[in-house]
Amino acid sequence: MPLYSEGFITVRSIPKGKSAQMSMVQSVKMVLAPPHPAARPFLIGGVAVALVGLFLSHWIVWLGVAFTLFCLFFFRDPERVPPGRTGLALAPADGHVVSVAPAVPPPELGLGDTPRWRVATFLSVLDVHVNRMPVDGTVTKIAYRPGKFVNASLDKASEDNERNALAIRMPDGRTVAVVQIAGLIARRILCDAREGDVVNAGARFGIIRFGSRTDMYLPEGVVPLVTEGQTMIGGETVIADLTP
């Protein structure tokens, strides 16, 4: 099977027919993926409504079933396979890129006032909402800041909305920042990471419920490889090459 080089990554070419079959299988696996633990109270609520509906109205039953199915879809947590190569910054979330531009990291992280490249990913209600670590390293700081709930696809969401910011120091001493940002519908940011945690690229660290945004600030001097409008797959899509 032929190989060809695409940038700095070697890609194995796949026949079109087989590629389509693989894509279909991957899509089915993603939809049927088990839910994130954060779904538990919502699933219990949906099932409870359906059970109560058995004694009241079939419409209530269907409402409970529909809500339960939606939660199973929204909170799906598919497995991801990070690239085998080290020295890469990976997407911290699924969605599509709404902004690639220099910006100053959140002041609460204490990373200084020098702008660095920021890649902002918008997550619609149809995207997987599990957040993943973009690099190997140590979580040096986590800072939560309350805020508004404006449309997460807008740039001002990075400044005005409720957010939870993490600083991750890589083994070489450089720092990457990831910011979980609540959106117009999302009203709950969950972060399982703790300061001092040693993490691996692609590892799960949290989830944002019902539509949101995730910003990633690259180390100073590192230029992103992605563009606005590009689709991101958390834990798999390469955002930047961190090799000095």
Curated annotation (Swiss-Prot):
Q: Where is this site: Cleavage (non-hydrolytic)?
A: 211-212
Q: How is the co-factor bound, per the entry? A: Binds 1 pyruvoyl group covalently per subunit.
Q: Does the keyword Cell membrane apply?
A: yes
Question: What does the record say about its membrane topology?
Answer: Peripheral membrane protein
Keywords of this entry = Cell membrane, Decarboxylase, Lipid biosynthesis, Lipid metabolism, Lyase, Membrane, Phospholipid biosynthesis, Phospholipid metabolism, Pyruvate, Zymogen
- Cofactor(s) for this protein? pyruvate
- Which residues in this protein are found as Pyruvic acid (Ser)? 212
Q: In which pathway does it act?
A: Phospholipid metabolism; phosphatidylethanolamine biosynthesis; phosphatidylethanolamine from CDP-diacylglycerol: step 2/2
**What are this entry's molecular-function GO terms?**
phosphatidylserine decarboxylase activity
Name a single GO biological process.
phosphatidylethanolamine biosynthetic process
Q: Which family does it belong to?
A: Belongs to the phosphatidylserine decarboxylase family. PSD-A subfamily.
Q: Which PANTHER family match?
A: ARCHAETIDYLSERINE DECARBOXYLASE PROENZYME-RELATED (PTHR35809:SF1)
The protein in question is named Phosphatidylserine decarboxylase proenzyme
Q: Which organism is it from?
A: Granulibacter bethesdensis (strain ATCC BAA-1260 / CGDNIH1)
> What is the gene name?
psd
